[in-house]
């Protein structure tokens, strides 16, 4: 049994992988429409991808919309993510604003988790961001995304262990495979993390059509969360959420 992180009524790191659905609307109307749709799906967590939100550089608008989302989502956990352009996101912002924005979001009390990128800054600065978010009882998913390649297994493990050392509650890595061997590399790293470095739950995925199996086999290999789309996918290879749920349940039933 590895580490378990509880967010409201959701336990990450236990049993069937949980499902997060990203919201990728560019304005309030689109986002609230997405929320109305996702509440009827088989999800566990809602991820607000604020890099898609056109007013993301206006903190007060972000906070106001987050408050409205929290009210509408009832007890569904919220993960807020600003994905930087260099890791596949929609836009780039300064490091200073990245820190300011995430701290302001944490201080509202209207989110449960915040994604912080491993390579957002130097290690000490990233560690400090995590410590400050923890002061608001926020769970931190520390992440790294490579949309071009799959690093060697040892490098994947090294990055996830580094996330744990910097205070992450959950370590996440997503990579792009160029071959089936790359997919196996990711699955092997996931399995080794689960068996030897289970200080935190982990989230891993191999993106694109080649890597779809990694979004389904988390219970077997050790990935605690998978991402499904309700409308538009936020990453290549994401499956429709209700179809994803059916497959996860089927796999779990035969374990």
Curated annotation (Swiss-Prot):
Pfam families xrefs: DHquinase_I
Catalytic activity: 3-dehydroquinate = 3-dehydroshikimate + H2O
Active-site residues, Swiss-Prot/TrEMBL: 145 (proton donor/acceptor), 172 (schiff-base intermediate with substrate)
Sequence positions that bind 3-dehydroquinate: 47-49, 83, 215, 234, 238
EC category name: lyase
Pathway: Metabolic intermediate biosynthesis; chorismate biosynthesis; chorismate from D-erythrose 4-phosphate and phosphoenolpyruvate: step 3/7
Gene Ontology biological process terms, A to Z: 3,4-dihydroxybenzoate biosynthetic process; amino acid biosynthetic process; aromatic amino acid family biosynthetic process; chorismate biosynthetic process
Transmembrane segments: none
InterPro entries cross-referenced by the UniProt entry: Aldolase_TIM (IPR013785), DHquinase_I (IPR001381), Type-I_3-dehydroquinase (IPR050146)
Function: Involved in the third step of the chorismate pathway, which leads to the biosynthesis of aromatic amino acids. Catalyzes the cis-dehydration of 3-dehydroquinate (DHQ) and introduces the first double bond of the aromatic ring to yield 3-dehydroshikimate.
Family: Belongs to the type-I 3-dehydroquinase family.
Official protein name in the record: 3-dehydroquinate dehydratase
């Amino acid at each position: 049994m590895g580490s378990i992180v509880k967010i409201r009524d959701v336990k990450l790191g236990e049993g069937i992988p949980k499902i997060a659905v990203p919201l990728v609307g560019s304005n309030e109307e689109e986002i609230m429409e997405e929320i109305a749709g996702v509440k009827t799906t088989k999800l566990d967590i809602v991820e607000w991808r604020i890099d898609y939100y056109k007013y993301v550089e206006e903190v007060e608008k972000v906070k106001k919309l987050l408050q409205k989302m929290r009210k509408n989502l009832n007890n569904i956990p919220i993960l807020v993510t600003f994905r930087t352009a260099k890791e596949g996101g929609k836009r780039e912002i300064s490091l200073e604003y990245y820190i300011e924005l995430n701290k302001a979001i944490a201080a509202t009390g209207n989110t449960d988790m915040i994604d912080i990128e491993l390579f957002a800054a130097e290690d000490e600065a990233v560690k400090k961001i995590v410590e400050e978010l923890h002061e608001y009882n926020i769970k931190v998913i520390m992440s790294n995304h490579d949309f071009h390649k799959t690093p060697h297994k040892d490098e994947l493990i090294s990055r996830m262990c580094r996330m744990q050392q910097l205070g992450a509650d959950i370590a996440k890595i997503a990579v792009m495979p160029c071959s089936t061997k790359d997919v196996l590399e990711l699955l092997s790293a996931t399995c080794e993390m689960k068996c030897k470095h289970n200080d935190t739950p982990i989230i891993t995925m191999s993106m694109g059509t080649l890597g779809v199996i990694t979004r389904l086999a988390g219970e077997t290999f050790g990935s605690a969360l998978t991402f499904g789309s309700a409308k538009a996918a936020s990453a290549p290879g994401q499956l429709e959420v209700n179809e994803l749920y059916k497959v996860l349940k089927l796999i779990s039933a035969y374990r």
